[in-house]
Amino acid sequence: MDDNSIQQSLLADNPNVLQRKPSEGVNRFRRCRSTPSTDPLQGPPEKGSSVKAKELFKEMRPSFRLVGLLLFIYLLVGVLAFYAVMDEISGKRTNRVLDALYFCVVTMTTVGYGDLVPNNDTTKLLACAFVFMGMAVVALFVSKVADYLVEKQEVLFFKALHTNLKGGETKMLRAIETNRIKYKFYTNALLLVLSIISGTVFLWKVEKLSLVDSFYCVCATITTLGYGDKSFSSKLGRVFAVFWIITSTIIMAQFFMYLAEIYTERRQKMLANWVLTRKMTKMDLEAADLDDDRQVGAAEFVVYKLKELGKINQEEISSFLEEFEKLDVDHSGTLSPYDLTLAQSAQ
């Protein structure tokens, strides 16, 4: 792209754009295009700036019903399949239907205790197919259901603090976005502790394992290590295991994912702090001067800072400028409703 097109797109040479003190009319025009109107004619804001959680988070809620349906179908098909070949699966039995469901869950979560194992080629191939499908279902379940549960807790937490957030809905959303990862991590860590405690106590009291063996079995299960020397052997134990294994392995996977996400976010914040606090140099000014007029306007400065933060790259900037030139039908260096009308009619 030549210098003239860049100059037109950044509007550095247009005296009507990026003035230091834009007129009140311009301010109102820009605000009404980017934020909700504060014009008195539009009516006063709602009393107390009440925020309805259902409306505020309508688009944020993940659609997990399909994932839940896939999980149900997987377990149903798995129970029917393994029930049909249960005679070809060796190990300690309790109930044919329960054992089929238990084996399906152990296979899906890749725990693999070894207390029930396929002993012919047909059941081995069936187990191979179900373990791959099960991992895909678990991955979808992790990304949908866990996020939904944590965001429900965020809504309740911020509704309690709503009276202290005078900025209203916008400020509330900003606060949630800033602390989202931390809340997910802390909530997930608490759920992980509760899962470990509940599994250990159950194995200790119901399966009659020692306290150390119970904790050992829990750790081998939630990490999907599954040595197989300790497992759920009673009928009640396998009923508990069907639900506990699914939830605990999902929680464990989420825990390490959020831990890595917190580390990544911290690195990003350190970079952002360095970019925003360091002093500009002459070399920085030269790099930010996109139109080579020896002056850096507000638009150029913002673009340069975004590039430093890694939020935008040169290819994206070029594509935005190309889009601007296509919309600027009259080549005035600015966009107006008239330009948009002409651009739409030309398509």
UniProtKB/Swiss-Prot annotation:
**Matches recorded under Pfam families:** Ion_trans_2 (PF07885)
Q: Which residues lie on this side of the membrane: Cytoplasmic?
A: 1-65, 146-183, 260-347
Q: Where is the composition biased (Polar residues)?
A: 1-11
Q: Result of mutating V303L?
A: Mainly targeted to large vacuole and partly to protein storage vacuole. Almost completely targeted to protein storage vacuole
- Residues annotated for Ca(2+) 2 binding in this entry: D328, D330, S332, T334, D339
**Domain EF-hand as annotated: residue spans:** 276-311, 315-347
This protein's superkingdom? Eukaryota
Segments spanning the bilayer are 66-86, 125-145, 184-204, 239-259
Disordered: region residues: 1-49
Quote the cellular component terms of the Gene Ontology held in the record. Answer: plant-type vacuole membrane; plasma membrane; potassium ion-transporting ATPase complex
Question: Cellular location of this protein?
Answer: Vacuole membrane
Biological processes per GO annotation: intracellular potassium ion homeostasis; potassium ion transmembrane transport
Q: Which family does it belong to?
A: Belongs to the two pore domain potassium channel (TC 1.A.1.7) family.
Its domain description in UniProt is: Each of the two pore-forming region (also called P-domain or P-loop) is enclosed by two transmembrane segments (2P/4TM) and contains the GYGD signature motif which seems to be involved in potassium selectivity.
Name assigned to this protein: Two pore potassium channel a
Question: What species is this protein from?
Answer: Oryza sativa subsp. japonica
